[in-house]
């Protein structure tokens, strides 16, 4: 598996999601399962995706006391997911305990990444929750904390990639939502970029939802996006 595309499965019903999944090739993408689908369908849905040979990013953004988050991360590892995330704003100790609990899994441990600042948030949104910093400043602060905790990477907007690469180095994974092929609607994302632009900026993985899942021919759109990506990244 070398694809940089993670398809976001944002559906209300299992049959709708599996209809899409059965149209696309697991060698061309991974799949993201978020709060809505996981709350409704649970672990059996993740297992159904695994049975179809897809790697799964379990996007539940854990944020709780350290012991609770660590146990949740361990449950994700037992489920066999490829990647799982938590909120960096939960603090250093929370992230360190989550990372430590994965040690017994060795090379089979999922990638553990953090969410810094949601891509829907702008300066005013941060100010309204008491953070007197720009999204970029807060992202850098939380990405540095994430790296200090030993996690594998962060979710970040494409506009933040270059500065995070400079701050965190080439081995720190950068997972980028807010990806919209040319001509797509921005939806609820505020900081967006095309797939090729994000890879050129230094993203490792691109999270793409509606441009693929709502396409008339999802398989062809997925192939087209993969073909558009720079080959030297």
UniProtKB/Swiss-Prot annotation:
One of its GO terms (molecular function) is orotidine-5'-phosphate decarboxylase activity. Its EC number is 4.1.1.23. The keyword Lipoprotein does not apply. The keyword Lyase applies. Pfam families: OMPdecase. It comes from the Bacteria. HAMAP family: OMPdecase_type1_B. Homodimer. This is Orotidine 5'-phosphate decarboxylase. It comes from Pasteurella multocida (strain Pm70). The gene is pyrF.
